[in-house]
Amino acid sequence: RFVQMYGDVVLGMKPKTKTEIDPFEAIIDKVKEEKGVKFDTELTVEDLKTLVALFKSAVKEHTGKDFPESAWDQLWGGICAVFDSWMNERAILYRRMNQIPEEWGTAVNVQAMVYGNMGNNSATGVAFSRDAATGENIFNGEYLINAQGEDVVAGIRTPQQITVEGSRRWAALQGISEEERAAKYPSLEESMPTCAAELIAIAHKLEDHYKDMQDMEFTIQDGKLWMLQTRNGKRTGAAMVKIAMDLLRAGEIDEKTALLRMEPQKLDELLHPVFDKSALKRALVVAKGLPASPGAATGQVVFFADDAEAWAEKKKKVVLVRIETSPEDLRGMAVAQGILTMRGGMTSHAAVVARGMGKCCVSGAGEIKVDYEARTVEMGGKTYKEGDWISLNGSTGDVYDGQVPTVQPELDGDFGAIMNLAAKYTKTLVRTNADTPRDARQARAFGAQGIGLCRTEHMFFEGDRIKAVREMILASDVEGRKAALAKLLPMQRGDFEGIFEAMDGFGVTIRLLDPPLHEFVPHQTATQKELADEMGITLAEVKAKVDALEEFNPMLGHRGCRLGITYPEITEMQARAIIEAALAVKERGIDVKPEIMIPLVGSLKEIQNQANIINTTAAKVFEEQGRSIPYLVGTMIEVPRAALVANQIAEVAEFFSFGTNDLTQMTFGFSRDDAPKFLKFYKEHGIIKTDPFEVLDQEGVGQLVEMGVKKGRATRPDLKVGICGEHGGEPSSVKFCAKLGMNYVSCSPFRVPIARVAAAQAAIED
């Protein structure tokens, strides 16, 4: 056994291909065949001696060296193997998943061994002081008679349960009778009652000492219990919350410790639909992408937004499969169970919008091949046609063949208790990014205290509104644009009323139109022809206008405040819709706090231009209605220059909201949608530690944010400051913003609980 494991772990004697079996197992199988036995345990001592000789010969053949006989050589070989393991593929992947810095390195423990394989009076196992899946205060674990610890961990043999209760539960799941269980699969409490009682007592003692759930490894050598190690056990999000609250109620830890025990990201697990665990074990993985938006989704494949809508109207569940998404796909995304994209990263359009909707999304699945013309997608060696069933796991990035049943997670009182604790200790408010009353209500249910970003452009794609938007874009003069905008005014006003009502007195930051106009016009000839017929103009005129709107670099082009400056009637319409909606809701007895945000400002002149239009429009509405309400005018800080001249911009702006998605793009010079092509390589080769679109780059982008806050407040000490990029829901970024003294962070609705806990932790750690 020693030669086999040393040869594998230290000398690297592993199968060379996936089809090849372990070289040592091949030798064992041959010897068993020669001896006419089925199980390893049936081999005699002489047979094992023969195996040792054969193993050593294999080592010499594979490595060209004799197996080391010196204990010191063996020890140093083992130590070096542990150090080398830091850079193996699995370790690198684990670090990437858990954001562990590569430079940390690993440690080596050297300790004397005890043996669990000295006969039927010896055993080995793993135990937990509480249930790591549910958090229940139930001691549990598994053991093997006459075995070593690796056998339990590696699953070489099927282990038995430590407690009688656990053993009976396991037998019930396996369909095994109580009589058969007791005879063939007894618990440790039944087979070695003295050692089991001692183990349970030690587990309680260790938990009392560490004040947390313990994961323990033990060996029983010839009837004597030896504890090998203990550590705070890994647990699910649900178990994390329950264990912390149970320990708090028991007086073992205080409120601050309970909050600090939270891993904010794990709260995600509690909020989205999940797959049935038993069904998941049988599911076939056909592709893997980025876990862009958590949750579980099952549906029929569709490739276009209008098809998704049509199928959904017939009560069909669909998964929208796209090469990449654009705002025009919003309708389809809204009705889909989940979204799968071939391109795009964790902060791509699909990912950001899906998180905002609480939709499951797998993005950047680069190995799939989408053919829009044939309406097929190739995954895992199979071609899926429109209507075929697939399932997505937005928490892992896995794509499954067929239907995998999902279940709704149950939020219990412990979740609410943790949220109440977060509210008690936090100094930084958490708002939400929400574009519809439904999103706003969902975020309020999670404890959001306002809206930090309401994107008005998403409203333009609903129903017949897109027609009015396109009329406005294609209009040949100001009067034509105003006529089209007049159709949009009541629609926008209605949207804003719904959002103000849902927020019920909390602040609402509404961003004026941001994307370039070419995103709103049709690019397919058939759709262009329909638009031309509706407007009474020629197809050539439509094509000419669409072509004129095309830009080489739209991200840095005619968008944001630049649109409002060149087409002031757009800003006028949106400002009027906001103010009229606020007055209407105020009339119903609801307190309203509108904050009008001008996007992409980079200079004082730009914000002066737009603020003048907003203030003039508001004054007109107040005069028309004979009443007024307070409102704020501010800007998004997303252009690096805005941070550099924040002291000037604050002369006009009454609040700053840092749009860190675009600020990161412009500071790094990375395209958010194209960067995934090389960022993975950058991370693997140590160029960057984390994806700057997922975790705020505090050394670079963060310095611009800090500069913007300080300069802005130097001009206007009462300047309200927040962040509304996707970083607003990432724990380390939230803590950074809290340290800068920001008033709030804003994130998608399903990230609100994560941000609330992270903000509370920042206040406690301060």
Predicted regions mapped to residue ranges:
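A generic local structural motif
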Residues: 305-308, 325-327, 347, 377-378, ...
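Conserved alpha/beta-domain cores
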Residues: 411-413, 421-766
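Long, charged amphipathic helices and adjacent flexible linkers at domain junctions
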Residues: 97, 259-311, 316-318, 324, ...
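Glycine-rich phosphate/ribose-binding loops and adjacent secondary-structure elements
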Residues: 224-226, 319, 323-334, 338-340, ...
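Beta-strand-connecting loop/turn residues
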Residues: 223, 375, 395-397, 662
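General secondary-structure propensity
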Residues: 338-341, 429-431
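Nucleotide/phosphate-binding sheet-loop regions of phosphoryl- and nucleotidyl-transfer enzymes
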Residues: 1-283, 310, 316-319, 326-331, ...
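Structural motif
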Residues: 109, 302, 319-321, 340, ...
